[in-house]
């Protein structure tokens, strides 16, 4: 009897908390190359929020005009969009104009973080370690420039579009003859192609929850992919990649990674939540920041829920915690929503 009563009280409490958020739009799908991943993330978030009594509704900006959010009287948005028009500051700017608070980073932080080259420039300016790179911009480079990249970065090296996620368009180039094809593949997706020094060693990722001084790093996950190839397919559609949490790094290294990630998160002025990817040189054990994802995946294979679970945070609680951070840029700067 008491067990049923406890369950009833827990459900009632969850429903009560959910009601405080008002009508919530879970933005999913969108128009980027990561649309399918976004739909998977969004469906998971939608189900989790509803299970906690939140009046949550799916909203696909590729199928509906964003202005309908205001007309339909949504109180806030959980952004489960990935890639362009979703985590690049575009939808964030639209929500700012509509006066609807949203999850994740604001306009400027989102637009900087999705641009891997801009992120690198900011990191280097702040003295944060990131792999050496060469930028190739469509229309301003020739075959000689492409051939010269291995001379500057060594082999192997990484070639990827500057503004895509989920490893879409990424190629690990192991010999000079593969450069032209790798650049052509990346250029199909972006006018800016990032060629990056390859760091051989442990690949790790670390989520962050919170804003400013209240931001905290979650447990680090070490990623062990088949043949070291953590590509789009291995990220989302296979079970052969290992995700180790606890990460099993040498003593003290996890804390160093967490501190570095928090520093990068605050440097870009991220808020709410994000996830940073890091490589650790196998010889020197020096960590190198690769990128920060300001709208991380929330699929069954995604890393933020996995790390949160290791910290004792369920998927449902994680969604609620992220939803609690909804804000507008001008609110966080001391203003109020119109």
Curated annotation (Swiss-Prot):
Recorded name of the encoding gene: ddl
Highest taxon in the source lineage: Bacteria
Catalytic reaction equation(s): 2 D-alanine + ATP = D-alanyl-D-alanine + ADP + phosphate + H(+)
PROSITE patterns to which the protein is assigned, alphabetical: ATP_GRASP, DALA_DALA_LIGASE_1, DALA_DALA_LIGASE_2
InterPro entries on file: ATP-grasp, ATP_grasp_subdomain_1, D-Ala_lig_Van_CS, D_ala_D_ala, Dala_Dala_lig_C, Dala_Dala_lig_N, PreATP-grasp_dom_sf
One GO location term (cellular component): cytosol
Entries under NCBIfam families matching the protein: D_ala_D_alaTIGR (TIGR01205), PRK01372.1 (NF002378)
Cofactor note: Binds 2 magnesium or manganese ions per subunit.
Organism from which the protein derives: Polaromonas sp. (strain JS666 / ATCC BAA-500)
Subcellular location field: Cytoplasm
Family: Belongs to the D-alanine--D-alanine ligase family.
Cross-referenced HAMAP family: Dala_Dala_lig
Name listed for the protein in its UniProt record: D-alanine--D-alanine ligase
Cysteine-cysteine disulfides: none
Binding site for Mg(2+) 1: 277, 291
Keywords, sorted A to Z: ATP-binding, Cell shape, Cell wall biogenesis/degradation, Cytoplasm, Ligase, Magnesium, Manganese, Metal-binding, Nucleotide-binding, Peptidoglycan synthesis
């Amino acid at each position: 009897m008491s067990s049923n009563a406890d369950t009833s009280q827990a459900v009632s409490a969850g429903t009560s908390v959910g009601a405080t958020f008002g009508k919530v739009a879970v933005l999913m799908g969108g128009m980027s190359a990561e649309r399918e991943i976004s739909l998977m993330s969004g469906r998971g978030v939608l189900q989790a929020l509803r299970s906690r009594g939140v009046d949550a509704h799916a909203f696909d900006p590729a199928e509906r005009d964003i202005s309908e959010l205001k007309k339909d009287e949504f109180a806030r948005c959980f952004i489960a969009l990935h890639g362009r028009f979703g985590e690049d500051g575009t939808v964030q700017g639209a929500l700012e104009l509509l006066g609807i608070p949203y999850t994740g980073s604001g306009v400027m932080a989102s637009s900087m973080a999705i641009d891997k080259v801009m992120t690198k420039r900011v990191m280097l300016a702040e003295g944060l370690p990131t792999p050496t790179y060469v930028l190739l911009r469509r229309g301003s480079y020739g075959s000689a420039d492409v051939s010269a990249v291995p001379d500057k970065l060594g082999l192997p090296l990484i070639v990827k579009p500057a503004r895509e996620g989920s490893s879409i368009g990424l190629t690990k180039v192991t010999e000079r003859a593969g450069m032209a094809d790798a650049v052509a593949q990346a250029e199909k997706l972006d006018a800016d192609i990032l060629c990056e020094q390859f760091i051989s060693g442990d690949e790790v990722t670390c989520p962050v929850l919170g804003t400013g001084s209240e931001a905290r790093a979650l447990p680090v996950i070490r990623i062990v992919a088949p043949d070291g190839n953590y590509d789009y397919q291995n990220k989302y559609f296979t079970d052969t990649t290992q995700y180790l949490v606890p990460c099993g790094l040498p003593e003290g290294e996890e804390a160093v990674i967490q501190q570095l990630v928090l520093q990068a998160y605050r440097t870009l002025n991220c808020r709410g939540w994000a996830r940073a990817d890091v490589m650790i040189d196998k010889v020197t054990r020096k960590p190198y920041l690769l990128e920060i994802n300001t709208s991380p995946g929330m699929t069954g294979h995604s890393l933020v829920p996995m790390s949160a679970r290791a910290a004792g945070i369920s998927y449902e609680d994680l969604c609620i915690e992220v939803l609690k951070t909804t804000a507008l840029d001008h609110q966080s700067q001391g203003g109020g929503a119109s």
